[in-house]
Amino acid sequence: MRTESAAEASEQYADIRSGLHARAWLYGTSTTREFIGGSKAVLKERAGNVPDGDFIAEAPEKFYFVSVDTEGIIGWQDGTFRKEGRPDAHVIEVLTEKTPLQYRSYLRERGVSYILAGKDSLDCREAVRKLGEYWGIEAILVCGGGTINWTFVQQGAADELSLVLAPAADGESETVTVFERSPLLLRPCPWSLH
């Protein structure tokens, strides 16, 4: 929500994010598309020869923008995420085995790394394991949206919660939520902090 009353909370959120010293930020598909202007991948009809498994592109960046995109729709121009006020970050896509080969080929051509985490649906624990194994990432900030936040919580892949609340409401049904169950997760799962 972009309101004047939420501006201070937004600044506090950025301060907390910086203070946690994580080298990786993780976002869901919709949030990532907002960051890159809604760009959608234009895929070739044929994938060509795409080897099985993960793809680790060469990258000088020591920060990582991790994007969960199991459908294979985000239109990256190259393998670096750039945003004023943040360090350049190497892009890592989290896909599943069912993500189209054409999209994997598209990512390879642009130097975007990707990992496969799950057969038909996202396996958050496998994603976290691979991010640690391949890039030495020990802490990941799962920054939204609500569906990816809840998916990590429900699968037991989140061990800490930092939540900033702003004194603002808009009453819109399209407003982004903090937690939202994915239709792919068939059963709700209660969660509490310990």
Tell me what each language-model feature is:
Residues 1-194:
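Enzymes that bind and transform nitrogen-containing heteroaromatic metabolites
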